[in-house]
Amino acid sequence: MTDVSRVLKEARDQGRLTTLDYANLIFDDFMELHGDRHFSDDGAIVGGLAYLAGQPVTVIGIQKGKNLQDNLARNFGQPNPEGYRKALRLMKQAEKFGRPVVTFINTAGAYPGVGAEERGQGEAIAKNLMEMSDLKVPIIAIIIGEGGSGGALALAVADQVWMLENTMYAVLSPEGFASILWKDGSRATEAAELMKITAGELYKMGIVDRIIPEHGYFSSEIVDIIKANLIEQITSLQAKPLDQLLDERYQRFRKY
């Protein structure tokens, strides 16, 4: 098994910690909030309020299930527009009260169903990209599994983007890439090699800012590393003048 095929397999493993796991292990007193105030509540995106080392923060992330029943309830981690609108509602609330935002990302992509398109999937993702680029509080995004397409990017316009060691981040799935390029989805591993989807490759290109080492899908060490780094980096980002924070975020994405 090549390194990229191993990463692809491990990034999608159902045994990975989820957003709700991290929300309860890293933060204190996490309280989930629901609904987009327009249509409904989307179980594929979760979010709420918590404390990090005594500081209020907003935590948002894409939630996959750990079994079939849970995955059905979470739509296999593929958000509908109401999920992205819920996330944006919580981010604007965080901006109003001066709370830093931490997002966790694990999705193959936004849900491509007819209903999602009818309710404005593209608009919801685009609105998040626009609003996050100018959100007046620090944002840190962490890839904890799959980071697929615009569905992932809609929570990743951040001051810093981190990846766990054995996760992936790409414009689309390797299967989709292979199907478009060669009309053969079975060449996914070959496509993944060309796409440069691994944390190490993306770090070298400056697309991600930090790689969190993994020692199995769950270890207290991973949680401790993420928590310590979040405390350090949020403190550093909060110390910057607002104009500098926003300009550096803008320049971060302009360089691509």
Swiss-Prot record:
Coiled-coil region: none
Reactions the enzyme catalyzes: N(6)-carboxybiotinyl-L-lysyl-[protein] + acetyl-CoA = N(6)-biotinyl-L-lysyl-[protein] + malonyl-CoA
Pathway(s) served: Lipid metabolism; malonyl-CoA biosynthesis; malonyl-CoA from acetyl-CoA: step 1/1
Cellular-component GO terms for this entry: acetyl-CoA carboxylase complex
Subcellular location: Cytoplasm
Molecular-function GO term, any one: carboxyl- or carbamoyltransferase activity
GO biological process terms held by the UniProt record: fatty acid biosynthetic process; malonyl-CoA biosynthetic process
Listed Gene3D superfamilies: 2-enoyl-CoA Hydratase, Chain A, domain 1
Source domain of life: Bacteria
Main location: cytoplasm
Location of the CoA carboxyltransferase C-terminal domain: 1-236
Keywords: ATP-binding, Cytoplasm, Fatty acid biosynthesis, Fatty acid metabolism, Lipid biosynthesis, Lipid metabolism, Nucleotide-binding, Transferase
Quaternary structure annotation from Swiss-Prot or TrEMBL: Acetyl-CoA carboxylase is a heterohexamer composed of biotin carboxyl carrier protein (AccB), biotin carboxylase (AccC) and two subunits each of ACCase subunit alpha (AccA) and ACCase subunit beta (AccD).
Function of the molecule: Component of the acetyl coenzyme A carboxylase (ACC) complex. First, biotin carboxylase catalyzes the carboxylation of biotin on its carrier protein (BCCP) and then the CO(2) group is transferred by the carboxyltransferase to acetyl-CoA to form malonyl-CoA.
Protein name: Acetyl-coenzyme A carboxylase carboxyl transferase subunit alpha
Native source species: Streptococcus pyogenes serotype M12 (strain MGAS2096)
